[in-house]
């Protein structure tokens, strides 16, 4: 039965009633990503936003961020937040129906239930990742997609990394066979695709130190590392390596998966949370030395349509001054490897490199690369290359380096486009299902 349902979702494009004016509902905004959706105004979106939450510091921080956007000197927003707080906040939102799109970014333990209930109530949903953190959540998510299809609604997760310029260019160059060749199949010991990221609990958002809720350290509420940031990395593998293609979960084979913990002391816990002790719900994860063991790290190797891919996510307490979250991405073709590095040599900014793997001379290869870059500049004027020790560095003008926070607006604009036309790109829904199916297989294999 499940195979039939998935096949139907893949075969039928997502179609909904066109929405010309979007009225946002913000549900229990426990994560700062909820505010980043509102970092700019959108012509299609009503400036009045109804917020439903239980109240408390997480809501206060969300409203403070919106106020910062509203009062900044350059291009301020003009959102009007209408807030309801109380234990019945979710029921109140459903009863009032003050909007037609729900933004969900908060405690992940509740997210899949919220998503399904919102869809069943006839509301479109724009959800932060991950939409599911356990196999039970994934079953709810499958139901939500089926309900959305039946009701003519759009459910979409916020995949910001598709809008990072180095990722866009890596994808674009891989489509030029004269430079990249064809994608290699790789092996478990030498995958053809590698996506790795390192994140930090302590960092700045919108120029201010980020406050984390204590539950962010609870994998039962935030999710383990193997099901969280991995959503971005699996999504990019599908989006970059197989552009505009729909997947079915049966095209994925999970080979190996593991998880491991990051130790967090009370002092480290206090810095982003303000708490000088571990809450009771974290006590089962505290060792005999009073150190919290957070299973926020995960890695797995799998095949997708026969191509071997490796995913790895790590979380650490705090980055060194001047550094931050980092990303490494490698796609290996028969003629070249396309590699994004973001380490010390790159001043912790992502840079794309083209590394020759063919017997062509450097001069011959560079001619082919120049032709490919010339075609890419039709969409991205100013892109260039320069020779470097490992091959060629792709030079990106500053105008395209908009930063991670701006990507939330870009995702929102894409979602608004889907709502305005009443049509979603036909591969989006099946690929979201395949993505979460892949991650859940890794989760189960890592136990």
Language model feature labels by segment:
Residues 1-7:
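Sec-dependent signal peptide recognition
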Residues 7-16:
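Hydrophobic h-region of N-terminal signal peptides that target proteins for export
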Residues 17-123, 136-155, 417-420:
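N-terminal glycine-/serine-/threonine-rich beta1-alpha1-beta2 phosphate-ribose binding loop
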Residues 57, 109-112, 116, 139, ...:
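A structural signal for well-ordered alpha-helical segments within the folded catalytic domains
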Residues 122, 128-130:
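Short helix/strand-capping hinge loops at secondary-structure junctions
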Residues 132-209, 223:
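A contiguous active-site-proximal alpha/beta segment in oxidoreductase catalytic domains
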Residues 207-324:
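Rossmann-like dinucleotide-binding domain that binds NAD(P)(H)
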Residues 228, 233-238, 245, 249-250, ...:
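C-terminal helical cap and adjacent loop that interface with cofactors, partners, or active-site loops
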């Amino acid at each position: 039965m499940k195979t039939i349902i998935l096949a139907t979702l893949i075969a039928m494009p997502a179609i909904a009633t066109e929405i010309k004016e979007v009225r946002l509902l913000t549900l229990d905004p426990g994560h700062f990503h909820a505010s980043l959706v509102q970092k700019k105004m959108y012509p299609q979106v009503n400036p009045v936003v109804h917020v439903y939450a239980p109240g408390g510091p997480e809501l206060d921080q969300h409203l403070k961020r919106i106020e910062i956007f509203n009062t900044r000197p350059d291009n301020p927003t003009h959102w009007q937040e209408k807030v309801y707080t109380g234990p019945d906040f979710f029921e109140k939102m459903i009863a009032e129906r003050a909007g037609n799109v729900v933004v969900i970014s908060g405690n992940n333990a509740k997210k899949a239930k919220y998503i399904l209930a919102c869809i069943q109530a006839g509301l479109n949903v724009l959800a932060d990742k991950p939409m599911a953190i356990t196999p039970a959540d994934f079953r709810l998510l499958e139901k939500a997609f089926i309900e959305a299809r039946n009701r003519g609604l759009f459910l979409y997760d916020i995949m910001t990394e598709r809008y990072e310029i180095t990722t866009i260019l890596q994808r674009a160059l891989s489509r030029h066979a004269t430079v990249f060749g064809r994608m290699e199949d790789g092996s478990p010991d030498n995958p053809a695709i590698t996506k790795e990221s390192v994140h930090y609990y302590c960092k700045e958002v919108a120029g201010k130190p980020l406050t984390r809720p204590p539950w962010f350290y609870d994998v039962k509420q935030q999710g383990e590392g193997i099901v969280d940031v991995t959503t971005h990395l699996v999504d990019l593998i599908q989006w970059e390596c197989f552009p505009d293609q729909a997947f079915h979960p049966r095209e994925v084979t999970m080979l190996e998966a593991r998880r491991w913990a990051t130790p967090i002391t009370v002092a480290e816990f206090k810095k982003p949370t303000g708490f000088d002790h571990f809450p009771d719900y974290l006590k089962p994860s505290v060792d005999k030395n009073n150190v919290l063991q957070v299973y926020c790290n995960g890695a797995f190797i799998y095949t997708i349509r026969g191509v071997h891919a490796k995913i790895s996510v790590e979380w650490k307490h705090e980055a060194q001054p001047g550094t931050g979250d980092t990303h490494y991405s490698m796609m290996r073709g028969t003629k070249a490897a396309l590699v994004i590095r973001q380490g010390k040599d790159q001043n912790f900014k992502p840079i794309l490199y083209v590394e020759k793997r063919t017997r062509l001379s450097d001069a011959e290869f560079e001619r082919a690369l120049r032709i490919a870059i010339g075609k890419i500049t039709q969409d991205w004027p100013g892109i260039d290359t320069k020779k470097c020790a490992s091959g060629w560095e792709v030079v990106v003008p500053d105008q395209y380096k908009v930063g991670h926070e701006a990507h939330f607006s870009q995702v929102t604009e894409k979602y608004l486009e889907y709502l305005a036309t009443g049509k979603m790109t036909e591969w989006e829904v099946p690929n979201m299902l395949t993505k979460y199916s892949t991650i859940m297989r890794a989760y189960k294999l890592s136990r």
